[in-house]
Structures are given as structure tokens and as C-alpha cells.
Amino acid sequence: MGSLRFSIPLDPFDSKRKRFHFSANPSQFPDQFPIHFVTSSIHATRASSIGSSTRVLDKIRVSSLGTEANENAINSASAAPVERSRSSKLSGDQRGTKKYVARKFSFRRGSNDLELENLFVNNGEIDVNYSAIKPGQSLEHCNGILKRLESCSDTNAIKFFDWMRCNGKLVGNFVAYSLILRVLGRREEWDRAEDLIKELCGFHEFQKSYQVFNTVIYACTKKGNVKLASKWFHMMLEFGVRPNVATIGMLMGLYQKNWNVEEAEFAFSHMRKFGIVCESAYSSMITIYTRLRLYDKAEEVIDLMKQDRVRLKLENWLVMLNAYSQQGKMELAESILVSMEAAGFSPNIIAYNTLITGYGKIFKMEAAQGLFHRLCNIGLEPDETSYRSMIEGWGRADNYEEAKHYYQELKRCGYKPNSFNLFTLINLQAKYGDRDGAIKTIEDMTGIGCQYSSILGIILQAYEKVGKIDVVPCVLKGSFHNHIRLNQTSFSSLVMAYVKHGMVDDCLGLLREKKWRDSAFESHLYHLLICSCKESGQLTDAVKIYNHKMESDEEINLHITSTMIDIYTVMGEFSEAEKLYLNLKSSGVVLDRIGFSIVVRMYVKAGSLEEACSVLEIMDEQKDIVPDVYLFRDMLRIYQKCDLQDKLQHLYYRIRKSGIHWNQEMYNCVINCCARALPLDELSGTFEEMIRYGFTPNTVTFNVLLDVYGKAKLFKKVNELFLLAKRHGVVDVISYNTIIAAYGKNKDYTNMSSAIKNMQFDGFSVSLEAYNTLLDAYGKDKQMEKFRSILKRMKKSTSGPDHYTYNIMINIYGEQGWIDEVADVLKELKESGLGPDLCSYNTLIKAYGIGGMVEEAVGLVKEMRGRNIIPDKVTYTNLVTALRRNDEFLEAIKWSLWMKQMGI
């Protein structure tokens, strides 16, 4: 807010009547001053309230800040412009005033003045006639010449200043330095200005030369340079120069404009430290704190204003009034208004507008309306800010009829609504379904110069908020609709909103009507629309948009097609996805990394691992494509599922060399997939590296490593790893099954039994897999009593036998030559409903061979074919072995030759 200077009589505060009474003696500032510090800029009036009230304040006398700084040796030139700029909003339009008052000169026609006039020449611009000037020229004459040049020519002023230096005219000459600092400030030659100020340090009474610093600070405030102005102020304090009112006023005005609270607090504290009273500084500090909602700090400043016996001026009253209104403390705000008028100030439209806005903020519109009607009774007429505040207030109160009434009155009086009013109205019209009103409001928006893109954003926001986005096509009529069809930005905003809310038909309709031409932008827009559908799960809509795109433009776009492949994959339409990929491939479009990732995942989800591998081979041929961490993990999983151990090993070392960042998921994936492809030392090193970097292996990783170490008979590592897994709390049934199997294969029955007990102790039931391991271990070691005991325990438990159990029994009984037991197991297997599988048949053929039942063994092969179970190499190998065991060499040779011919 501007800075006004009024002489205010101060009287004590009457607490019963809630009025502030002040006497002429500032020492009578009341102790019971009932004001809590509140701060704010005058937002209540939407920033236009100050300018709208100038007609009320035309007759108020404004004292320049320069009168407070009459110590200034240069006619307070550095101070007056600051005060004028700060008070212009309240004192009326001063645009006709020249910027630099100090440039106006009037020489009396005495002998000295005539002598000065003879020293100037005019060669396009005023300069000094150095041939006529004498080194003995008086200091007063030199300063007069410099002053004249400063107002006319910066270059010539600097030139003459250098002449004065050469002729010893600058020692102790603060006036000359101040004048040249004005020039340097305008030219922003700050380094030279700093050098000159440092020169002044050695002069006598330099500590009193505040005008030197005021000059450069003023130049900074004119340019809005907060950082540099603060630098000069800090330097001023470091050199021991005491600031004056003008210094503080300029700085606080600059800090208020830029909402720089830290520097404002610094300047304000030093103002009080030096005992300077600058009324506008208090207002600025209150304004900054209020704007930043630091209300407690604002209260402290108001208390300081009382302690410092500040004579309140209009701006002080207004910022306090606004501070209370911003907080909704309207009783205190009204008491401020009463006291302000009692102090001799005329009714002020700014004050009333502030109160109206304050009541609107707390939804007390009856009180706001009462103030509005009171304006005429006190000789004030509502201005545009009054109407605007009423519109906003009724809008907050959700009263469309009243807001609409004041909006119409605003227009009837010849005022224009601001963007806030229009935003309020369009929101109410969207909520209450006034389509015709919305169309008129949109016309008003365009009438006041609002940009179409901004209007569209407001409309979409308003109708989205009330869930009526489907109404938007009905209110976008005429020129607005034409603009949307012609303007790419507005067009894209609207179709994106339509797609977001499932209005794909409206989107397609608008796409058919577009009038702009930009193929690159259009492709990008289609891609965004399709991606938006994908993210919101509207996959069918994405297909519609894609089909529309292909109808109007058959050119294949890599990004759009890749996204559609991904969408078809999610929909499970793998044939459509593959068709798009093949189109890309045949068109010669080269896939990028993302495209390859999408196609690979498509084939993986479709179960076509071989096709996925072929795509990866094509990708490897393109040396410029470097997979990211996600694609690397996909490749690892694919090669693992395809059991491509060589590729896994090669890929592992490729990942190591790629320089990508390994996270926890990458370590787990590499260990899980490459466990059987890597040397044991490399695998162990990767695991130790993972632990060293603070990553936690998951359960699968621990189980895979337990299996690898167990098969390698590294039981010490198995125990260490198992304990580590328990420490991390990731041990599961599979972990126990794995170590039980490892001990079983190594015939370590003691540790195997101990693992079974620990499994039960940890709350796990003995699993079917564990029972199968025990049966296999004891059976192969021909401990048949143990075998039968385990079998009985398993049948009593909840774990019923599976194919693997029956196959173990057939194998063990067959190895013993117990054909009757084998027959019983086969019968039980068939009665269980499971029936023999490939492994069962292979085991039976082996058992029949041992038992001398060759014909039955050959019959099993025929039975397999009859049940559509395709014999494998193990089947035929077991059959040939059975025939040889039973001296059927000729038949064995026939089967061997047949296997060779079939490539088995």
C-alpha cells in the first residue's frame, strides 16, 4: 500500500463504545489499545479498491516523505520520489509528474548564474566547455555544473566528475558523489558505485552521509532489485552510517512489493534500533505478515506501533482494518472503522469494501449487505470493488440468485467484472444448471479480454467439480466453438477432458470437426488420448480412438502402435496385438527399447516363449538399443523358463558391463534366474555383494541358493544361509523341504531327521514334499522298515500321496523286484483317480524289466499311446534296458534302431 502522511489527533480508547480516541499528544497512545496484530495486503478490495477511491481522497493533504528527510542535502531528491510512488494509489493519479524532480533547475540571473551558463556548450547534448572552465572554479560552481549535466547527459556527467577528481574538487564533496551515484544507478554500474562509496569512507563526517546510500538504494528500488538494495543497506550499517526515514521507507516499500519477510524484518529492527519512526514501515511490515498469514507476528508489530507512539496515518488504519477482516475478526474491524472516522478521517470506500469482503469470507452476507446499503447514507457510492466483493461473498455463501443480482447491477453501472467474479458465476451456473447464464458469462469473459484457453480451463474445472462435464458441449457455442476447432491447445484440452470422463463419442465428434493441420501434433494428441484411456481402464475406448485415427491417417506411428499392442495384450487379444507387431515389422519401422519391451511381454503373456526369444534376438542385432533394468529382468525370466543356460550366463555378464544401477529386485532376479547358469563362486559373490549393499534377499532367493549349495554338498554354507534366512524372517516350507532334500540325497539321516523336527517346532506341518524326500532316501538306501514307517505316517497325516509318491513307491519296489507290491501300487494309483503319468510309466517299465515281465513292459508303451501320453527318450531307454536284461537282444536292437531313425 502507498504511504500517506497525515497529522492525526490522538485520543484515548473508549472500551465501552469500542472506539479509539486519540489526543494530539502521542504519549497518550492508549495502553488498552485492543488490537491483536494482524497483517495483510489489501486483498479485500482485489487490489483495485485503492485506485477506485481516489476521488474520495482528492482533498486530503499528502505530505511527502521528503519532508521527513529534510536533512538531505540534495533537496531530498532520493526520498521524494519514493514517497510519491508509495502514495500514488491513495492520493490520485500523478502520471503527469516528471520522474526526476531533481532535474528541474532554475538559475537566477545573477552574475554567478550567467557565469555558469557561459561554461556550457550544446553539441546535440549539453556538455562543459572545458577550455573555458578554470581549475580554480569554486566547489559550489562545480557542483552546479555536475547537477546540470546529471539531469541531461549521463556520459558527460561522468566525464566532468572525473575532471573534478583530477582538479581536487571531490574531497569531502558528498553532493558530487551523490549526484554521480544517481548516474551510476541509472546505468547499473554497481561495481563503480561501490568503489566510490568506499572512497568516501575516508572523508570526515562520512557517518552522516546517508544521502549517498539513499541514492543507490533508490535506484535499486526503482528497478525492483531486492538483493542489491539489501546489499547497500548492509554496507551502510557496516560503515557506521545511520539511515534516515527515507532509507527505511524505500527499503520497506521494496520488501513489501516482493514479499521478502527476512530482509523486511532486518530493516524494521534497525529502524527501531536507531529510534527512527517511519509510519509506512509499520504498514509494510503488517502487510507482509498478513499476506504470509503470520498473524502472531503482525500483532507484535501493532503492539510496537503503540509502544513507539506512532501517529497513525490513513494507511496504518487501513492495513489494521484489512488485517482483522482477513481473519474474520469483524467486530474488531468495525471498531477500527469507528475509531478511524472519530480520528478525523472521512468515510472511506476502501475501508467499507474491506469490511464487506471480510464479512463475505466468514459467510455473514447479511452484515455485508447492510454495509453495502449504508454506503449511500454516508455519502459514498458503491464502486466496482463493492459490487465485486458482494458477488464473491454471495458466491461463497452458495447463493446464486444474489450473486447474479449483484453481477447484473455491476454491469448496469457500467463496471466490468473481474476474472474472480466470472469464475464465481460460472461455478454457480454449473452447479445450478443455468446453461443460458453460463453461455452469457462465457461471452462476458471473452468481452473483458480473457484468453480462450483460460476460459476453457475455468469451464472444465467448474463442470468437473459438480460432475456435469457432459454439459460442456452445450455451453461451448458460436465463436468459442470455432476457436476450439481452430486452436490446437484448446482443442487438445477439451478432447482430453472428454476422454478422461468417458465421453469418447464427443471426443471423436470433435476430432472429425478439427480445422487445424499439424501431423506431428495430431499424432502426439492421439497417443495421449489412447494412453489416457489405458490409464483409466477404458480399453475399448482406446480401440475406438485408434480405429478412428487409422481411418483418417493410415501412417503407422511407432508409439501409438506400441501402446495399442500393450492394450490388446491387457485385453487378452494376442492375435490383434501380434498383427500390429507384424505390421510394424513389415513396414520397416524400427522398434525402440520400449517397443521391444512391449512386444516381448506380449509374447510372454501369450505363452509364446520361443517368439519372445526371437524378438530378443532381433533386438540384440540393433547395437544402439540398450535394455533398461525392466527389460533386462524380462530377458532373464524368459531365458530361465526356456532353460537357455548359455544365454543366461552371457546376459549376466552383459548386465554387469552395462553400468545400470542394481536394486534389490535386480539382485533377486539375477540370483533366481542364473543360479544354475553361473559358476558357484560368481553366484556366491553376487549374493555377498547384495548383502554388503544392504539389500534383503527374498524367500525365493534363499531357497534357490539353499538348493544350489545342497546339491554342491556345501552343507556348512547351507546351515549359514538357513540361519540368515531365519534371521530375516523369510523361511517357509519350501526352505525346509530344500534342506531336507539336500540331506536326504547325501544320506545324512541325522540332519535330515533334525530338520524335520525343527520344521515342526517352527510351526510347519511335515509337508508332502518332505515325506516324499524321506521315502526316496530310505527306499534307495534299502531301509525298508523305515520306508514302511514313513509311508504309514504319511497316510495318517493330512498329506495324501501324489504322483511323485506313487512313482517313488513303484521305483523302490521295482528295484527290490517286488512285483506284487508294484501291482498293488499301480492299482491304488488308478483307483485314486490320478492314473499313471509319463514318469509312472517309465518307472513301471523299469520295474517290469527287473521283474522279468518283458511283454508287460512292451504293453505299457502301447497303453501310453492309447492314453495320448507320448513316450520320451527315458521310456524307450528303459524298454531297451528291460529287453537286454531279459536276453531279448534282437528286440532290443530293433527298438534301438527305431529310436535312432526317429532321432530320439
Swiss-Prot record:
Keyword Cell membrane in the entry? The reply is: no
Where are this protein's PPR repeats?
Answer: 173-203, 209-243, 244-274, 278-312, 313-347, 348-382, 383-417, 418-452, 487-521, 522-553, 557-591, 592-622, 628-662, 663-697, 698-732, 733-766, 767-801, 802-836, 837-871, 872-904
Q: What span is annotated as transit peptide?
A: 1-61
Q: Which GO terms describe its molecular function?
A: DNA binding; mRNA binding
- List localization entries: Plastid, Chloroplast
Domain of life where this protein originates: Eukaryota
Q: Transmembrane ranges?
A: none
Recorded GO cellular component terms are: chloroplast stroma
| Region entry Disordered, spans | 75-94
Keywords, A to Z, come to: Chloroplast, Plastid, Repeat, Transit peptide
The record ties this protein, via SUPFAM superfamilies, to:
HCP-like (SSF81901)
Q: What is its main location?
A: plastid
Q: Which Pfam families match?
A: PPR, PPR_2, PPR_3
Supply the NCBIfam families for this chain: PPR
UniProt family annotation: Belongs to the PPR family. P subfamily.
Descriptive protein name: Pentatricopeptide repeat-containing protein At4g30825, chloroplastic
**Upper lineage:** Eukaryota, Viridiplantae, Streptophyta, Embryophyta, Tracheophyta
